[in-house]
Amino acid sequence: RQERMDATEQRSFQVGPLTLTLRQCLADGRIAMANFEASTTDQSPAICVGDVTLPISDKEAKRLGVDASLSCMEVAEKLDLPLYCVRALMEVTSSANAGTSMEDALWNNEGKLNYLNLSYLEPTQVKDTLPVRYYLAVRSYDPATGKELEHWIVEEESEIPILPKLAEKVYTLPSGVSTNGFQVKEVKAELYDTGVYFTATLLAPQGMQLDDEAMLQLYSSAIKDENG
C-alpha cells in the first residue's frame, strides 16, 4: 500500500497563504485515501493545525521548545506566529460512498501538517476510475482572542484510477455455523495490492428486529479459523 501511495502524481493547490500538496492518494474497490501536506507558500514560520483547540503533539512541542500541555492556539500566541486551521479532503460521490469516512491531522518530523482522510467505497459503484472532489479549506485565527480572521476554500473535480482486484475467493461454510446468533452463509476474500478484504454474508434469525442492540451484536461478531 505504501508503494502505491508514494507513486501518486503530486499536485499543489494555493489556498490563501498556504500551499496544500497532494502527497499520496489511492483507491481500490473498497477504500479511497489521500494525504495532503500543508505549508506556508512563502516558507515563513506558522502553526498549521487540524483543530485549534487541541493540545499540540509531544513531538511538535519538543521541536518548538514549548510545553506539551499548551493548546495549539496558546503555542501560536506564545511564539507570536500566525495560526491556520486546515481541512483537506478527497471526497467521493454519494453513490460510491459506503457511508463511513475518517480524517485526521498529524505533524511529520519536519513540523509540516499532514491531513489524511479515508472513505469506504460501495464496490458495486466502483468502475475503472473514481470521480472525486478535492475540498481544501484554510482558516486563519487570532491566537490571542480565538477569533476567526479569514477563510479560504478551493474545490476541484478530478478522477483517480482504481487499483484492480487481483484475486477473489468465496469460502462456503458448513450449515449451522453461527456467530452471535447470526448464521454465517459465506465469507468472501478479495485481494488487492493494498491488502485482503474479507466480507461475510450473515443471516439474521427469523423475526429479529434490526434495532440498535441487534446491530451491536452484528458488529461485535467475529469469524475465526481453527488457528484463531
Task: Indicate residue ranges for each PLM-predicted region.
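Alpha-helical, hydrophobic structural elements that either
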Residues: R1-G228
